[in-house]
Amino acid sequence: MEHVDKHAVKAFLLSLQDQICQSLESQDKSAAFEQDEWQREQGGGGRSRVLRQGSVFEQAGVNFSHVFGTKMPASATAHRPELAGRSFEAMGVSLVIHPNNPYIPTSHANVRFFIAEKEGEAPVWWFGGGFDLTPFYPFEEDCQHWHNTAKYLCAPFGDDIYEQHKVWCDKYFFLPHRNETRGVGGLFFDDLNEWGFEKSFAYTQAVGNGFIDGYLPIVQRRQDTPYGEREREFQLYRRGRYVEFNLVYDRGTLFGLQSGGRTESILMSMPPLARWEYCYEPKAGSAEADLYENYLQPREW
């Protein structure tokens, strides 16, 4: 039977949270993460870290959680009846960054591991995760850098992995009621176990470690770009799409709220400010129109 080292996964996730928080603090320079350790009554807990009102980041949340129980939630066993009667553990790091400057994109990343065990039987396990970018005033070179980072980290795992997980990301982060993508995508994968534990874990580590490589150069390039009220208003309007996606479609948010997760940590992904405007239309030829015309449908980078 293949050895599944869940302790190594947890150690990696805790280290990843530390590394990402340190990188973001070093970039912001004026604000630090506040840590909130919490326990889940049914088993497990986590540590949530939030940086607020920094010079670069309006809000950044980086959450680690490790929850477990003797019985799977009904919402999970409905889709996977083979999990009934098994104890489970779910652990992961999830983060969302909302910058001050509208020229810096919002970003999101997540890596997670799930295992369900029963004495005398092989464990059922899988990895999932990815990262995606949501620009308001997009630059082609930023989007290409983001996707080139993804291509590079995928290459050792197979020639078609980037394309598969890029397409999956485009499909997942899509708002049907708006007929637009949430942003310019990146990578998304779930239920990954067919490679065996070692390779699946190595890929998940590559995705987690690749996030900062993809994101910080964009932040550094755009953080001093001058902007005014018009850009700020548009940023807040587009943040509304983030709220719509997370509350209506995001599986992690819905699962967390339905399974008695910690609400403050689950909703940490929400922007501190957002706005809606009735029947908004960008002006023809404007930078805002460029986003709608060229960046909110899947494309090759």
Swiss-Prot record:
InterPro entries: Coprogen_oxidase_aer (IPR001260), Coprogen_oxidase_aer_sf (IPR036406), Coprogen_oxidase_CS (IPR018375). Its main location: cytoplasm. This is Oxygen-dependent coproporphyrinogen-III oxidase. A divalent metal cation binds at H98, H108, H147, H177. Pathway: Porphyrin-containing compound metabolism; protoporphyrin-IX biosynthesis; protoporphyrinogen-IX from coproporphyrinogen-III (O2 route): step 1/1. It catalyses: coproporphyrinogen III + O2 + 2 H(+) = protoporphyrinogen IX + 2 CO2 + 2 H2O. The keyword Secreted does not apply. One of its GO terms (biological process) is protoporphyrinogen IX biosynthetic process. Substrate binds at S94, N110, V111, R112, G260, G261, R262. Disulfide bonds: none annotated. The active site is at H108 (proton donor). It holds the Pfam family Coprogen_oxidas. GO terms for cellular component: cytoplasm. Residues 242-277 are annotated as: Important for dimerization. Involved in the heme biosynthesis. Catalyzes the aerobic oxidative decarboxylation of propionate groups of rings A and B of coproporphyrinogen-III to yield the vinyl groups in protoporphyrinogen-IX. Its cofactor is a divalent metal cation. It is found in: Cytoplasm. Belongs to the aerobic coproporphyrinogen-III oxidase family. SUPFAM superfamilies: Coproporphyrinogen III oxidase (SSF102886). The keyword Metal-binding applies. Its EC number is 1.3.3.3.
